[in-house]
Amino acid sequence: MRWMDAPLAFDGRPGPTDTLGRAMRDLRISVTDRCNFRCTYCMPKEIFGKDYAFLPRDQVLTFEEITRAARIFVSLGVEKLRVTGGEPLVRRDLPDLIAMLAAIRRPDGGALDLTLTTNGSALRALAGSLADAGLRRVTVSLDSLDDAVFGAMNGIEFPVARVLDGIDAAIEAGLAPVKVNMVVRRGINESSVLPMATWARETGVILRFIEYMDVGHSNGWRLDEVVPAADLIETIAAVWPVEPAEPTYRGEVAGRWRYADGGGEFGVISSVTQPFCRDCTRARISAEGVLYTCLFAADGHDLRALLRSDAPDPEITDAIETIWLRRGDRYSELRSAATSTLPRIEMFAMGG
């Protein structure tokens, strides 16, 4: 029997399940479409130059609107909130929003798992206040320890040392364990895989290698630039013996691998070569309040209009529940020449 024919049995916790039996447990909330980097796989500078028109402020969800939406999603079973962008740390007064989100409680009274993904450029300045506001952990995007290679990936001249200092600040503030995401693109930064792994083993951060993905249409994605997760694991294992580790929770997207010598662990996110659609429990809200049920979605659902109308919470709850009940996304499972021509939303706009 194919997996899509067999609904998955989640554990009876509250909330809807989609047409493939997947519950809604994770919500990624973009707080801005702006970013100070121009990463080649997300916002290439050739397209998103200095004159690019980002969203005007009145089209971006307010902190109050974000918090209201998050509270409704939590009532439907969401247990993990991740704040994203763009680059979320460019959003003014972000610790205030973190405090508002941290105050939300699950139906059973438990606290949420509140996390944030950042490029790390402003972490030294903000890590302490984010932790004080209730943030639990951070994930930092870092594609190389070499300044030249890092610049080739992020599109600007920004010192690796400042990102590393931001990671140190996050650890000092208690936002640990820090995870570091490394997108690997053949011909640009695959030579950085072993240096990054060595650094992660020495510092205790959890490094996660991400296959270069075809999100949006601006990054010029080509399959031959993808370094398969299996190759990455083989590269690591040739230096340090590794063994597979069990996932820490249902729906975890990274395959976990443990160093046999006790030197920590690393992860691989293999959306291209080993899709994880069957366990995807994620919903996404963009900075302008559009709900997406897949990272590769062609369109979404306007929550901002509901949030800014006179609609009471139960009406918005019903709308979100209906959207999830009808969800049947599995783009990565179906990836082909045909799907590559479908319209898709850019990663920075959706809040990947």
What are these regions (language model features)?
Residues K80, W324-G352:
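Short flanking/linker segments adjacent to small metal-binding domains or redox-active Cys/His motifs
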Residues G216-S332:
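Accessory C-terminal segments flanking Radical SAM cores
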Residues T19-L61:
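Canonical Radical SAM [4Fe-4S] cluster-binding loop centered on the CxxxCxxC motif
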Residues L8, A148, I156-L164, D168, ...:
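Radical SAM enzyme [4Fe-4S]-AdoMet core and its adjacent flexible, acidic
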Residues M1-M24, F37:
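Recognition helices and adjacent regulatory flanks at domain boundaries
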Residues F63-V83, V90-I210:
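Radical SAM/AdoMet-radical enzyme domain recognition
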Residues G49-A53, R124, D146-N154, G216-G220, ...:
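A short acidic, helix-capping loop that chelates divalent metal ions and anchors anionic groups
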Residues V31, C39, V83, L207, ...:
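Conserved, mostly hydrophobic/aromatic
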